[in-house]
Amino acid sequence: MTGLYHLKPDSAYTVSVRDGEKEEGSISLRTEAEYVTLNVRQFGAKGDGVQDDTHFIQAAIMACPKNSRVLIPEGTYKITSLFLKSGLRLELAKGAELRADTDSSHFPIFPAAIQSYDEKAEYHLGTWEGNPLPMFSGIICGVGVKDVVIYGEGVINGNASKENWWNNPKVMRTAFRPRLFFLCGCRYVSLQGLTFMNSPSWTLHPFFSDDLRFIGVTVKNPADSPNTDGLDPESCKNVEILGVRFSLGDDCIAVKSGKIYMGKKYKTPCENLNIRQCLMENGHGAVTVGSEMAGGVIHLNVEDCLFRHTDRGLR
């Protein structure tokens, strides 16, 4: 999977595919118009790997107007949790790295479930292995947002190791470990081209979210890292996973829909998942259904994928 970057806004391009001198095909396209680009350096981010750049990047995100883009240029940006907003376009340029802090006391906590005033409903945020449980907020978080595109040639590094998040990984210390990328109740979210690595726990975890696209993304975690699944859609609908490269220490893709409590209460399956042209290596399972699947799974398609050195292909 090859991405195209550094294109000008509102400009026409023709992309051709050639076999030597012979043109096999072409497609014409026009990039979206753009009002302004907000460079996070203009908001105070240094990208020196020392200053905590969380608030400066978050300010750029919140200030970004419609039909505009937040740009994170080359540099190493120390962060805790960044929160997405609807309509956001966020680009991580080549050489840009978001590197997570590893001090859990610096992270917000997502409570497990908050009771509604009429006591007839629950608002779920924190989740751990299919149950409503408190967790630290993800490095990149989206809650109730829609129409978001995050793309580029940059890296999102959870910075996890056995000295921090991977130490006694099954023990809840105030809250459970954060995800590297977490969505809750979101729609129309796309990730394109980015590299995700060294996740504290599950790497990409969309939860009760629909109409998602993961295209040309790379997920890399050490082979001995605990519970660092690559992509775990949980009770999600209409998910496209195309050209993603996985190399990690657990399941590459684990399709989920909650344990008994969540499955019985919400009866929300994972539905309409299309997995194509992905490379999955060094994991326990390439594509697995469960565990945590009390809500069921409907219409899962896997085609043209390569499984290399995984313990199991399909489970």
Please provide the spans of the model-predicted regions.
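Extracellular/periplasmic carbohydrate-active domains that bind, remodel
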Residues: 1-315
